[in-house]
């Protein structure tokens, strides 16, 4: 997505956290143009509160945001649905669904008129084998996007999800 955006003339700022930060750095190295990277933990309110300041170091405003964030602890995947502890479920839902709202609202002050938020999704209508609480989190992501679209439409902010089909992720390996 970042490469295509740059090829269309967009300036891109990337975020990452934890193990994902090193992956983001590797991906940034393959882009046609250098892209700044901001460390962002969507479960850390201080990171979210400081996001506008960090982005403004590179861009005056945002035309759009891509939400490509998802995580579920190993205990929330792999066929242990009935025995998963709430802490693991809460982590999956916070990182994979609530973060769409958190990220969108953290970026809202930077949105230019007509801004767009696009999130990456996977089919939450099917109880996929071993996907377990990540499937529930994806269903929550879909619902979250509808409520954000309802509430931010008045600000001319569009919220959409796209499902690219199965992608090799940690959750897919379960």
State the predicted function of each range.
Residues 17, 42, 122, 164, ...:
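Active-site loop/turn elements of alpha/beta-hydrolase fold enzymes
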Residues 66, 118, 159-162, 172:
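Hydrophobic structural elements of the Rossmann-like NAD(P)H-binding subdomain
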Residues 37, 162-163:
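Low-complexity, Gly/Pro
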Residues 1-87, 174:
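Short-chain dehydrogenase/reductase
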Residues 11, 61, 116, 158-160:
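Structural signature of beta-strand start/N-cap positions in the alpha/beta core
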Residues 1, 70-109, 113-154, 165-169:
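Catalytic loop of short-chain dehydrogenase/reductase
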Residues 15, 43, 104, 145, ...:
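Ser/Thr-centric signal marking residues that sit
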